């Protein structure tokens, strides 16, 4: 078996199973695929080979994952229900739910947004190749939100240029741990890839420019949780998650960047499920061929509504 890369991760936070930790730290791989790699002897903890996916990890331990070269993927249409908000001959706008991976990768050969798009939408751009037809931008697996899809290569190139030149408009609703003091603020700090954990990012002066604006919508003082409206001016990977973690306010549910399950009531934790409390609810862009400004918004998914309702009901 040929190895394409070797990744190292440092365990932070609460005790967790090895397979669950790696599936969260390396979201491109499904948990079942991670289990397979562990059993094949491709995972080491503190320098020792571990073949037991249920092995409990503790804070400070180091995990090394040997990633095998990917096999060619056969991406097929699948009748996965998705909400298509808008569609014309050039674009489609869809609502991606929490838990749905955007495109196939090793361990995620089916059950992705791309599989759903191939079934529901006749034509998709080919610039992204077999694995990413129509995909112009991404949302994390644990994040719900609105996405624009390109149906031809002309639209694809135009939309990619808009994202690169920051001509799009992106707003999020976010629940973070802790009481954010200022009603309005901006986080203007560069973001770089973590030198050890290559799937994570952190604030570093030598990183790429990243600007995040935020407005406080409500503070739930009893539980030390803040609801924010957030606008990102740059599109760095994990930008909102990294920026708020850097000021001591991790996104609820985001254990990769410092959220601790013990910091919220168990009842609230169960309502959150596997989702990060982060919604890409607003997307604005220029139509790639007509040039008109278009804005699309979605309502909060049921998971988020349940969390909001619980906080409202249990707050004084």
UniProtKB/Swiss-Prot annotation:
Instruction: Mention one GO molecular function.
Output: pseudouridine synthase activity
Q: Which family does it belong to?
A: Belongs to the pseudouridine synthase RluA family.
* Catalysed conversion reaction: a uridine in RNA = a pseudouridine in RNA
Q: Which Pfam families match?
A: PseudoU_synth_2, S4
Entries under PROSITE patterns matching the protein: PSI_RLU, S4
Query: Where do the catalytic residues lie?
Result: 140
SS bonds (residue pairs): none
Which CDD domains does the record match to this protein?
PseudoU_synth_RluA_like (cd02869), S4 (cd00165)
Q: What is the designated name of this protein?
A: Uncharacterized RNA pseudouridine synthase aq_1758
> Gene3D superfamilies this protein is in?
Pseudouridine synthase (3.30.2350.10), RNA-binding S4 domain (3.10.290.10)
| The organism's place on the tree of life at top rank | Bacteria
Instruction: Provide the S4 RNA-binding domain boundaries.
Output: 16-89
């Amino acid at each position: 078996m040929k190895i394409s890369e070797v990744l190292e991760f440092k365990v932070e936070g609460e005790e967790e199973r090895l397979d669950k930790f790696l599936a969260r730290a390396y979201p491109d791989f499904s948990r079942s695929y991670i289990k397979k790699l562990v059993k094949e002897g491709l995972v080491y903890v503190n320098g020792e080979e571990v073949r037991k996916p249920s092995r409990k990890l503790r804070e400070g331990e180091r995990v090394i994952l040997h990633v095998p070269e990917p096999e060619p993927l056969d991406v097929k249409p699948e009748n996965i229900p998705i909400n298509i908000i808008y569609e014309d001959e050039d674009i489609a706008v869809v609502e991606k739910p929490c838990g749905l991976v955007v495109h196939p990768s090793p361990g995620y050969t089916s059950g992705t947004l791309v599989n759903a798009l191939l079934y529901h939408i006749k034509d998709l751009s080919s610039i992204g190749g077999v694995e990413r037809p129509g995909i112009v931008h991404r949302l994390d697996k644990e994040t719900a939100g609105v996405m624009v899809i390109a149906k031809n290569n002309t639209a694809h190139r135009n939309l990619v240029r808009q994202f690169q030149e920051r001509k799009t408009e992106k707003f999020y609703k976010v629940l973070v741990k802790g009481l954010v003091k200022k009603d309005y603020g901006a986080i203007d700090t560069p973001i770089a890839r973590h030198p050890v954990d290559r799937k994570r990012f952190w604030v570093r002066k030598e990183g790429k420019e990243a600007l995040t604006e935020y407005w406080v919508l409500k503070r739930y003082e009893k539980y030390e949780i803040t609801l924010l409206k957030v606008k990102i001016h740059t599109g760095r990977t994990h930008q909102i998650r990294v920026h708020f973690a850097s000021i001591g306010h991790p996104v609820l549910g985001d254990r990769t960047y410092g959220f601790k399950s013990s910091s919220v009531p168990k009842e609230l934790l169960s309502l959150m499920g596997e989702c990060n409390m982060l919604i890409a609810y607003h997307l604005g862009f220029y139509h790639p061929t007509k040039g008109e400004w278009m804005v699309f918004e979605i309502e909060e998914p049921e998971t988020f509504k349940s969390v909001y309702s619980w906080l409202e009901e249990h707050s004084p």
